[in-house]
Structure formats: C-alpha cells, structure tokens
A protein has these predicted regions:
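Beta-strand initiation motifs
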Residues: 22-29, 49-51, 70-76, 121-132
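Beta-rich catalytic cores
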Residues: 12, 37, 60, 85, ...
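Residue-level signature of beta-propeller blades and closely related beta-rich strand-turn architectures
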Residues: 9-10, 58-59, 95, 108-110
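Conserved blade-ending motifs and adjacent loop-strand segments that build the rim/top face
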Residues: 28-42, 71-96
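Loop/turn-rich, solvent-exposed surfaces of beta-rich toroidal or solenoidal domains
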Residues: 32-74
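Residue position within the beta-strands of beta-propeller blades
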Residues: 5-6, 55-56, 104-106
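Structural signature of eukaryotic scaffold interfaces centered on beta-propeller domains
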Residues: 1, 42-49, 90-102
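Structural motif
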Residues: 11-18, 61-67, 111-124
C-alpha cells in the first residue's frame, strides 16, 4: 500500500514522497533530498513483499538510488558510464535473450536510452540474489 512519487519542487527539496494507495493522501514521509531533480521511480518487485524502489537523480552523470521496498532504507547507488540528465526510467523484469534477469532502461540526455542488466545491479550493490532470477 505504498506509492512513491518523484517531486521536483526545490522549495521543499526535490525528492521522493510517500503516498498511500488506500485513499489517504500524502503520508508525511519524504526521503532525503536529491542533488538535482528527482526523476523516474520504479518498483522492482522481487516477490509479493520484497524488492526495491529505484529512482534517478538528474545530475551528470545520473545517479540511480536504490531503496528497500519495505523500509525505504537506502540500499545503494550506481551510475552508468554514459548516462546523464535522465528524465525517465523503465523496468523490464521479464527475461529476454540479452537480459535473462531483466533490465533497467534509462533515458540519456534526451538523445538515447541506456540499459542496465539487473544481475549487474544485484551484484554491484549486494542486493537480494532472488531479484536476479
């Protein structure tokens, strides 16, 4: 029963804000402010209860922030070699020939799309290995 929305209002700090899907509005909880603009946010569901939220900080290079699905505790950050000023991200959890465990796609500088193998993210941040299956 959680929805995270990327809020870019710098007057109060660009960050993720927590809302409820059960009809209540803003729950009064915000994550720490981002350096740039809080951009796309996706839920990486590893099971019915476990997983991670991934959001992107629109800086150069883009910084991808990973949070525990249940607690919202930071699980780590990562960047790509050629990914900057990301406006949006999309998560594909289905297997494909190129990405057997799925991929995170990120818009790069309004000109291209970058892809991150979910297995690489799991390894780099020491996340739950069940998320890479």
């Amino acid at each position: 029963d959680r929805l995270l929305i990327a809020d870019q209002d710098r007057r109060v700090g660009s960050t993720l804000r927590e809302y409820s899907l059960s009809g209540r509005r803003y729950l009064g909880r915000s994550l720490p402010p981002f350096k740039g603009d809080a951009e796309g946010v996706v839920l990486w569901a590893c099971s019915a209860e476990a997983g991670y939220w991934i959001a992107v900080d629109q800086v150069r290079p883009s910084e991808f922030r990973v949070y525990d699905r249940r607690t919202l505790a930071p699980a780590g950050t990562f960047s790509g070699r050629t990914v900057a000023d990301t406006d949006g991200i999309a998560l594909q959890q289905d297997a494909s020939p190129r990405f057997p465990a799925g991929a995170l796609f990120a818009q790069h500088d309004n000109v291209a799309v970058a892809a991150f193998d979910l297995r690489d993210i799991v390894r780099a941040l020491r996340l739950d290995p069940a998320c890479a299956r």
